[in-house]
Amino acid sequence: MATARTPRFLLLFCRSCRSLRGPQSRAYAALVPGVSQVDNGSDFLGKKPHRKHPGILHLPHVQLPQALADAAQLMLFERPMRSVEKQVQALTNYLWSRHLPVEPEELQRRAAYLEKKFLEKQDSAPTEEKLREAVLHALRKTTYHWQELSYSEELSLIYMAARLDGGFAAVFRAFHEIQARIPEFRPQTLMDFGSGTGSVAWAAHRTWGQSLREYVCVDSSAAMLGLAEKLLKGGSESGKPCIPGVFFRQFLPVSPKVQFDVVVSAYALSELPSRADRIEVIQNLWRKTSHFLVLVENGTKAGHRLLMDARNLVLGEKEKSPLDLRPSFVFAPCPHELPCPQLNASKSLACSFSQAYHPIPFNWNKKPKEEIFSMVILARGSPKEANRWPRITQPVLKRPRHVHCHLCCPDGHMQHAVVTARRHGRDLYRCARVSSWGDLLPVIAPSEFPPSSPDEEPPEN
């Protein structure tokens, strides 16, 4: 049989590709000098496939409990409103783009800076009144105008249609982190600050079931509390609660001695009017925490920075509580108690995660969605109890024979790790390949991980 000859130029091209590929792969692998083997302390390699390694924490599409979805649909259909879809989209966009209120000290600093700039540009000194008007005009144009949201019955329904499913998905993912890593933890009491639609109670009930005997839902809005209670009763005021032991309050419990196994604040800290209010609430929530304090906010820079402020505040409160002397540590997502490397980077990024979910099946809500959120879970006890595997902070890029993982490491540095089977072993390579954004990578990490330089990062393709 006659065989076709390969053109000479094609042979030369293939040889050149091979010569380029070898050194490049070695350069990729060299980016993770300290990651050399899987941490198989729990002997999972002999019991589970790689796709089920103990660092896997991501969830498939989350779906609301059917009773909750049915109740939400019933309540919205019972009260027809004009342009519901447009109102839902407008509120969703507004809440996502919301910033924290500007503190008075920052406002004064900006005003002084603008006044100085105006005076430098003027040939003759303006009158005090004109200067004041110019500064105020510039401040209005450049400063975020924060307004407190006041929830009426109608706005509460719009909020339910906009945020019930996404909020449930984010909180359920946070609870799953605790349940997956400490399956023996069986909480009996839970408090939810800024409870809104009550999605936290539903997510907790799905996670821990009948072990929870008391849920205290705290929200300043009477309309929102009424909506949450109605959802709990299947959409009617006279129905039987789907979850027993749920109590609704407008104020936090007064007694400092009352503690709850799990305390939650989901998308509520960002609604407080000042930094002083946030500090007071966070300290109060931590005093009421017996085991875990779960904080969730939007996956934006503002949401992430707010959570890092709360994290640093609680970690700085060590040995200051006269009622509970157990120290605090970060359970998730950080594998350390050091300053956040995402905030300290030259180009700061939000440490956020993604959870896919099936939305409530309204007419405009048919496609699966993703909730982008930031979270921090603080716990009482010794940091030695925590798992210190690196956290995957971005989507994993799977390429031929190598995997890109962006890791937050136990030494407080970010690392762009490119894992190969040849350099790091088949087990670690396969664990990395089946891991996703938000998972832990089960590796024996070095005590000191050098921070990655932007110049060292290989191309993604």
From Swiss-Prot:
Keywords: 4Fe-4S, Iron, Iron-sulfur, Metal-binding, Mitochondrion, S-adenosyl-L-methionine, Transit peptide
Top-level lineage group: Eukaryota
Binding site for [4Fe-4S] cluster: C334, C340, C351, C408
Example of a GO biological process term: mitochondrial small ribosomal subunit assembly
GO molecular function, one term: S-adenosyl-L-methionine binding
Subcellular location(s) per record: Mitochondrion matrix
Transit peptide: 1-19
Subunit structure: Associates with the mitochondrial ribosome (mitoribosome).
Function in brief: Mitochondrial ribosome (mitoribosome) assembly factor. Binds at the interface of the head and body domains of the mitochondrial small ribosomal subunit (mt-SSU), occluding the mRNA channel and preventing compaction of the head domain towards the body. Probable inactive methyltransferase: retains the characteristic folding and ability to bind S-adenosyl-L-methionine, but it probably lost its methyltransferase activity.
Record's protein name: Ribosome assembly protein METTL17, mitochondrial
Lineage: Eukaryota, Metazoa, Chordata, Craniata, Vertebrata
